[in-house]
């Protein structure tokens, strides 16, 4: 288990750790103060690579991380946090991006459920439109960029109402000929993962992977009910309850859009 950074630690003479704000299997995310730009806070993502990898593969993974961090740094879209820096210290790699204040959509959904309410459809559709803008931008890059871990907790709403798609930990760049290159290894979250994403890095994924997760995320937000896992639906197609059977206030148009996005057979 990697030793965590401590509050007050300064990396690269610039980024002073404030506190940990997220943790995963490959590292942690910290809130940090940028000592060169007074008042600016940033999110510092620390990546600890699998030390059991052969030396050549480990080196390749690290070079790949830094190379593709450069790709992320070129992205400029209102619903994506800006990546501003990347570097390595010892065996760890770091990605610096905008810190996004506000609550994530999972928090808002759980609050509504505790109050025996559903999130208003018009609000969720507004968020969905912003998410669609972000995904269209990513998928239209050359080569296309996938997020691969779209879910309510990775969508943050700023105090001004701007939606941000956060956690680029599973971003994948699609190289020409559909050869896939993974920035940071990961397989997404089962509730929002389509069939084709199972199987790790050997699995076939393309932009439809994000579309499925988009639909599954909307399903969860609008019904306050976790969507059935794709593998279970494959064995039992009736396993997924239509959204309007849970939330009768939903429009038929929205239900159809969700079920279309969550189609098990994207072709």
Predicted feature locations:
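Activation segment signature within eukaryotic-like protein kinase domains
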Residues: 127-128
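C-terminal lobe helix-coil module of Hanks-type protein kinase domains
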Residues: 191-267
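Activation-segment/catalytic-loop signature of the eukaryotic protein kinase fold
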Residues: 86
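Conserved short submotifs of the Hanks-type protein kinase catalytic core
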Residues: 90-104, 108, 112
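Conserved N-lobe loop of protein kinases adjacent to the ATP-binding glycine-rich P-loop
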Residues: 33-42
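Protein kinase catalytic-loop region centered on the HRD/HxD motif
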Residues: 131-145
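Protein kinase glycine-rich loop
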Residues: 17-25, 29
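AlphaC helix of the eukaryotic protein kinase fold
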Residues: 48-74
């Amino acid at each position: 288990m990697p030793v965590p950074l401590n509050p007050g630690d300064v990396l690269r003479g610039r980024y002073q750790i404030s506190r940990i704000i997220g943790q995963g299997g490959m590292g942690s995310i910290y809130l940090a103060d940028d000592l060169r730009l007074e008042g600016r806070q940033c999110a510092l993502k620390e990546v600890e690579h699998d030390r059991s990898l052969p030396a050549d593969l480990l080196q390749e993974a690290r070079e790949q991380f830094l190379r593709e961090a450069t790709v992320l740094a070129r992205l400029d879209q209102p619903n994506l946090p800006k990546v501003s820096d990347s570097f390595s210290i010892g065996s760890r790699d770091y990605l610096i991006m905008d810190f996004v204040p506000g609550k994530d959509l999972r928090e808002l959904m759980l609050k509504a459920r505790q109050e025996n309410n559903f999130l208003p459809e018009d609000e969720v559709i507004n968020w969905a439109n912003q998410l669609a803008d972000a995904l269209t931008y990513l998928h239209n890059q050359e080569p296309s960029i996938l997020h691969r871990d779209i879910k309510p907790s990775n969508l943050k709403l700023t105090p001004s109402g701007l939606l941000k798609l956060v956690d680029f930990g599973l971003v994948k760049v699609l190289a020409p000929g559909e050869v896939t290159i993974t920035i940071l290894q990961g397989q997404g979250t089962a509730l929002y993962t389509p069939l084709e994403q199972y199987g790790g890095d050997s699995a076939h994924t393309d932009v439809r992977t994000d579309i499925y997760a988009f639909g599954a995320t909307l399903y969860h937000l609008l019904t306050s009910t976790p969507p059935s896992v794709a593998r279970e639906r494959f064995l039992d197609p009736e396993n997924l309850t239509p959204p309007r059977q849970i939330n009768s206030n939903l429009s038929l148009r929205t239900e159809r859009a969700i079920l279309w996005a969550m189609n098990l057979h994207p072709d």
